[in-house]
Regions:
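Conserved, structured core segments of small domains
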Residues: 1-97
C-alpha cells in the first residue's frame, strides 16, 4: 500500500537539515524499492520548507515507523509530519488506476 509522508520544517531548521542530510540520503538509498517519489517542498523563493516521501509499506503503522526513522526527524528538523494513505491514479501522464 502507498503512503504519503508530508513533513514541514521548523523555521530554524536549516543548519540541522544540512547536518543531517548525508544520513538522510543513506536512509533513502537503503529504502530503495520501497520509495516511489521523494523531494523537497519549496517556498515562493525556492527554499526548502519540508519534504514529501511516497513509500510502499504494508500498513499505516509501518509507514509511521518508516517516517520516524528519517534522520531529519531525529535531528529535530520537522515541525510537523503526517502520514496519509495514497492512491496513485496517474503516472508519467498515463492513467494507472
Amino acid at each position: 500500500m502507498l503512503f504519503a509522508i508530508v513533513s514541514y520544517d521548523k523555521p530554524d531548521a536549516l543548519e540541522r537539515r544540512l547536518a543531517a542530510r548525508p544520513k538522510h540520503l543513506v536512509w533513502l538509498e537503503a529504502a530503495g524499492p520501497q520509495l516511489r517519489y521523494v523531494g523537497p517542498l519549496l517556498d515562493e523563493e525556492g527554499k526548502q520548507r519540508g519534504s514529501i516521501v511516497v513509500t510502499e509499506q504494508p500498513d499505516l503503522e509501518a509507514a509511521r515507523a518508516f517516517a520516524r526513522a528519517d534522520p531529519f526527524w531525529g535531528a529535530d528538523v520537522f515541525a510537523t509530519q503526517t502520514v496519509h494513505a495514497f492512491r496513485e491514479v496517474f503516472r508519467d501522464g498515463a492513467r494507472v488506476a
